[in-house]
Amino acid sequence: MEKLADLNYTLSVITLMNDTLHTIMEDPGMAYFPYIASVLTVLFTLHKASIPTMKIALKTSRCSYKVIKYCIVSVFNTLLKLAGYKEQITTKDEIEKQMDRVVKEMRRQLEMIDKLTTREIEQVELLKRIHDMLIAKPVDKIDMSQEFNQKHFKTLNEWAEGENPYEPREVTASL
């Protein structure tokens, strides 16, 4: 266990791998060498990191299945990211968390819609009351005897107040 976590040991293994690859592929024009070396380095690092982590997690944790599942999913997600995929593997727990979040958001939006609907109903009732107050009274209750084309039939002396309401008046404004 001490050898697995030792940084010098890990670095010496990586150097040994690089030296071995250099001796195997002596062709200096090898174009894929950096890619192969980086993939092998990542795989070695994952191997070195995952085994001690899983051993420690199994010893300290009571729920070993969930920890192993999480470690495996993390390793596969790392490999998928290195391969260039944007998709990730998710566990049922993560899916349930996302579904709970979506359901919570839907409930919040339904409550907001309910509040807005209640406000709109109150506004419609208020507009109906305002309309009922503003409704014009029926024509048969208003005395229209003074309004029927009096300028054609009556003279100035016959008007009720003594002057024709349809004639323009002179208005002077003070400056």
From Swiss-Prot:
Residues 52-175 are cytoplasmic. The chain crosses the membrane at residues 29-51. Belongs to the rotavirus NSP4 family. GO terms for molecular function: channel activity; metal ion binding; toxin activity. GO terms for cellular component: extracellular region; host caveola; host cell rough endoplasmic reticulum membrane; membrane. Glycans are attached at residues 8, 18. Residues 1-28 are lumenal. It is found in: Host rough endoplasmic reticulum membrane; Host membrane, Host caveola; Secreted. Ca(2+) binds at residues 120, 123. Homotetramer. Interacts with the immature particle in the viroplasm. Interacts with host CAV1, early and late in infection. Interacts with host integrin ITGA1/ITGB1 heterodimer. Interacts with host integrin ITGA2/ITGB1 heterodimer. Interaction with microtubules blocks trafficking to the Golgi apparatus. HAMAP family: ROTA_NSP4. This is Non-structural glycoprotein 4. GO terms for biological process: monoatomic ion transmembrane transport; symbiont-mediated activation of host autophagy; viral process. Binds 1 calcium ion per tetramer. It is a single-pass type III membrane protein. The N-glycosyl content is primarily Man(9)GlcNAc, with a small amount of Man(8)GlcNAc. Gene3D superfamilies: 1.20.5.430. Plays an essential role in the virus replication cycle by acting as a viroporin. Creates a pore in the host endoplasmic reticulum and as a consequence releases Ca(2+) in the cytoplasm of infected cell. In turn, high levels of cytoplasmic calcium trigger membrane trafficking and transport of viral ER-associated proteins to viroplasms, sites of viral genome replication and immature particle assembly. The secreted form acts as an enterotoxin that causes phospholipase C-dependent elevation of the intracellular calcium concentration in host intestinal mucosa cells. Increased concentration of intracellular calcium disrupts the cytoskeleton and the tight junctions, raising the paracellular permeability. Potentiates chloride ion secretion through a calcium ion-dependent signaling pathway, inducing age-dependent diarrhea. Keywords: Activation of host autophagy by virus, Calcium, Enterotoxin, Glycoprotein, Host endoplasmic reticulum, Host membrane, Host-virus interaction, Ion channel, Ion transport, Membrane, Metal-binding, Secreted, Signal-anchor, Toxin, Transmembrane, Transmembrane helix, Transport, Viral ion channel, Virulence.
